[in-house]
Amino acid sequence: MSVVVTRYRGGGPQYMNASSTSPKPVVGEPSIRTHALHALAYCERLFYLEEVEELRVADAAVFAGRRLHVQLQEEGEHVELELASEALGLHGRVDAVKTREGTLVVYEHKRGRHAPGGDAPEAWPSDRLQAGAYALLVEERFPGAPVECRVRYHQTDTTVRFPLDAALRGAVVAAVARARLLRASRERPPVTQEERKCAKCSLAPVCLPEEERQVVGEERPRLFPEDDVRQVLHVATPGTRVGRAAEELVVTPPEGEGAPSRQPGRMVSALIAHGAVQVSAQALAYCVENDIGVHWFTSGGRYLGGLGGGAGNVHRRLRQFEALRQASVCLGLARRLVAAKLEGQLRFLLRASRGDSESRQVLASAVRDLRALLPKCEEAPSLEVLLGLEGAGAARYFGALPYLQGEDVDTRLRFEGRNRRPPRDRFNAVLGFLFGLVHREVEAAIRAVGLDVAFGFYHQPRGTAGPLGLDVMELFRVPLADMPLVASVNRRAWDADADFEVTSEHVWLSKAGRAKAIELYERRKRETWKNNVLGYSLSYARLVELEVRLLEKEWTGKPGLFATFRLR
C-alpha cells in the first residue's frame, strides 16, 4: 500500500517483540489512525504531540512525501480504500492492495532509504509496524486470503517483503494498546534518549528536546529554527477587502486606490486587519484551515483579538490550569518575569553614551535604582509586592528614557512621560501602537502553542486582554517597542506633521504613520539575536514563540529556562 509519507523516520523495536495475537474489542472508544502507529514506534512523545495534542508541522520532508503521493496517483499506483476495524481499534486509508498468485499484497511507499541488513535490505521497525497494521485491516476486510506486506523505499529503489506473521500481529496489538494508554494520559512522555531521532523530526521546534536537555547542563545541537520564512500580511487601508482565490489571499483596495494584490497562502503566517477592513468568510475559513492567524486592531492601534486554529487538545490547557492554580508556581514565574523586565530596562539604559553630564547623571541614577530592585524581586513574598517593584522600576525607567533621545530630535517627538488611552503626544501614539503589535504577537504565539491566554500567573483579569498575554508581553516591550522607537526617532525617521493626526484630546497615527510603524516593527522582528542562555541565534519573532514554549515546559518538562534571556 502507498500511504502519504509525511516525514522520514527510523524506528526502534519497542513493539516488535509482543506476543499477543488477538485484539480485544474496542467499544465506544475512538479508533487509532494506522499512520499514527508509525510515530508511536519512532517516538512516544512524537505520537503524543501529534495524536493527543494535535500538533503537526509541515516541513520539507512533509512536502516531499506529498509530492511522492501525487506522483504515484498520476502513475496509477493508488487505488484508495478506506478501512476501519472496531475489533482492532484502527482506521486508515489503504492506497494499494494487489493480488499476487492468490496472495493479497499490501504496499507501503517510503521516500527514504531501507534499513541496513545482513544479506538483504530490511524494513525499519516503524515501517514494519505500520504496514502490518494496514495488513490486518485488509485481512479483516477480505477474510480467507493470505496477506503479505511490502515496503517500497524510493531513494534506494528497493522493495522489502515480509509476512503478516504472529510476531507482527502481536506487535500491532501491543502498539494499539500502548497508544490507547498514552491517549488517556494528561502527561507527555519524556524526550527520547535516542538523540539522532530528534534531528530528523519535524516536531523538534515544538518538542524542544535540546532545550530540555540543556536544563541539565548538556551540550546539544540547535533544532529550533532561526526564523519563520512566512510573512505577516497587514491590511490598514479603510474599505479594503480580503478574499480568497484558490491558494491565494486577494487584497482588493477601495475603488480608485490601486489594483488587487495576491499573496500565496503558504507564505503568510498571519493576516492583520487594521480598522475598517473586510475579510470574507471564504478567506477566514482558508486561514483557519491553513493555520494562518487572523487578528483585528482598531484604527487607533488597540488590539481587539484574534482567530487561529492553533493546537486544540484539552490536555495542554488542563496541565496549564493545574499548574497555575498553585500560588507557589505563579509567584516563582512572576519573580523571574519582573526581574527579566527590569533587567531589560536597565540594560537598555546602559547602552546610552550620548548626552551632557546631566544626562549621564540621570541615567546612572536610574541604573543604580533598577539594580537595587533586582535582588528584591527574587525575595518578593507576594504578587502584590512584585507589582510594587515593577511600578517603581517603571517610574525610574520612563523618567530616564527622555535622556536616550538625541539633542536634535524634534520637540514634538520628545518623550515627556507615559500616557495612553488615548495617547496625548506623538511618541506615546507610536509606542502604544507598537505595544498593540507586540500584544498580538504574544497572543498568537500562545494560541499556536495551545495555551489559554485567559489564564496567567501574574496579571489579573481586566477588560478583554488575556492575562497570560500580558504576562509574556512584559519580556518584549523593551526589545520590540522601546528600542526600535527610540532609535527611529533619533534617526529622524518620523514626520511630526504627515505621520500623525493631532486633536485637542488625543494624537493618532495617520495612514502614513501606521505604515511606517508597521514597517519598523516587522523589520525589528526579523532581526536576529543570540540567546545568551541557549547559545544560538534566532529572530525576535521566533524568540516570542520560543519563550511561550519554554513557559509550557515549566510544568510539562524540565523547568528553568523561561524568562532567562537577557539583552546584550
Swiss-Prot record:
Keyword Calcium on entry: no
Pfam family for this entry, one: Cas_Cas4
InterPro entries (UniProt xref): Cas1, CRISPR-assoc_Cas1, CRISPR-assoc_Cas1_C, CRISPR-assoc_Cas1_MYXAN, CRISPR-assoc_Cas1_N, CRISPR-assoc_prot_Cas4, Dna2/Cas4_DUF83, PDDEXK-like_dom_sf
Positions bound to [4Fe-4S] cluster: 43, 198, 201, 207
EC number per UniProt: 3.1.-.-, 3.1.12.1
Annotated residues for binding of Mn(2+) 1: 95, 108
Region of interest: CRISPR-associated exonuclease Cas4: 1-209
Tree of life domain: Bacteria
Binding site for Mn(2+) 2: 390, 459, 474
Cofactor, how bound (note): Binds 1 [4Fe-4S] cluster per subunit.
Chain's role: CRISPR (clustered regularly interspaced short palindromic repeat), is an adaptive immune system that provides protection against mobile genetic elements (viruses, transposable elements and conjugative plasmids). CRISPR clusters contain spacers, sequences complementary to antecedent mobile elements, and target invading nucleic acids. CRISPR clusters are transcribed and processed into CRISPR RNA (crRNA). The Cas4 region acts as a ssDNA exonuclease, while the Cas1 region acts as a dsDNA endonuclease. Involved in the integration of spacer DNA into the CRISPR cassette.
NCBIfam families (alphabetical): cas1, cas1_MYXAN, cas4
Family of the protein in this entry: In the N-terminal section; belongs to the CRISPR-associated exonuclease Cas4 family.
Assembly: Homodimer, forms a heterotetramer with a Cas2 homodimer.
Protein name according to UniProt: CRISPR-associated exonuclease Cas4/endonuclease Cas1 fusion
The organism of origin for this protein: Myxococcus xanthus (strain DK1622)
Species classification: Bacteria, Pseudomonadati, Myxococcota, Myxococcia, Myxococcales
Gene designation per UniProt: cas4-cas1
